[in-house]
Amino acid sequence: MNIAMTGGTGFLGQHLTGVLTRQGHHVYILSRNARETEQKNMTYVQWLSEGAAPEQELPHIDVWINLAGKSIFGRWTEKTKQHILSSRINATREVQRLIQKQKEKPKTLIQASAVGIYGTSLEKTFTEDSATSDEDFLSHTAHLWEKEGQHIEAMGIRTVYARFGVMLGEKGALPLMILPYKFLAGGTIGTGRQWLSWIHVEDAAQMIRYAVENAGISGPMNVTAPNPVDMKQFGKTIARVKHRPHWLPVPEFFLSKALGEMSLLIVKGQRALPKKAITSGFRFTYSDLEFALSQLIADRKTV
């Protein structure tokens, strides 16, 4: 299949491109910067920049994968929050415009979202059947992001809303979470009771590939491992794998002072389960956190 991907140069996008091209799909990566590649089954197409005309360069596209959006890591000023939201909305609207330009519509859209759409809770468990929330910046952003995708779904295109948990890999949150343990200063963050719905980046890429190739999957899909953990368990698992102590607690108020509103990512959470992936037959390689962390650290993919 011909697959167009936004956000293809990012953390997940690079892994996903490898998975899809190895399956024989041709991936067209939409990027602000034009570039050449000798990699088989991969083409870069310039978009969202001066002089770009992706509608003239793209062939018929069978599947769109929309991952584009500014990273949520970093202190959230009002300007940063505006950019986080607008980058996602504008990219999705441009995808819609490009789809409308095609003579033949694609079969599928994979629209990125996040488990933050459920809000936060210590007690509740969230599946794709659960109600969504609009209680904070993350849930509000995910809600509006999916709403933009619904305009494309209304064109009769099978749409999967990939609600991502915290991805573990060589980039993203994990290197930052491991860093204190390198300096023998690891410990429980906040109360330690907050949930972390994690997923190994390779399982995340494989789950998206699975959704692309299985026409029976549509609507929201939690892209998380089947065994979420609380932050205390997560920290103790890092300590075991790294052979480092777990002893120095990090109070919630300290994180709020240091990180501002972004501390919400760390001190709040939700227990999200991948019900749709499991019932449809997807098989996880990394369902156990200790195995996932051991593999990442052993392969030196993570500092």
From Swiss-Prot:
CDD domains: SDR_a8. Coiled coil: none annotated. It holds the Pfam family DUF1731. Belongs to the NAD(P)-dependent epimerase/dehydratase family. SDR39U1 subfamily. This is Epimerase family protein YfhF. It comes from Bacillus subtilis (strain 168). The lineage of its organism: Bacteria, Bacillati, Bacillota, Bacilli, Bacillales. The gene is yfhF.
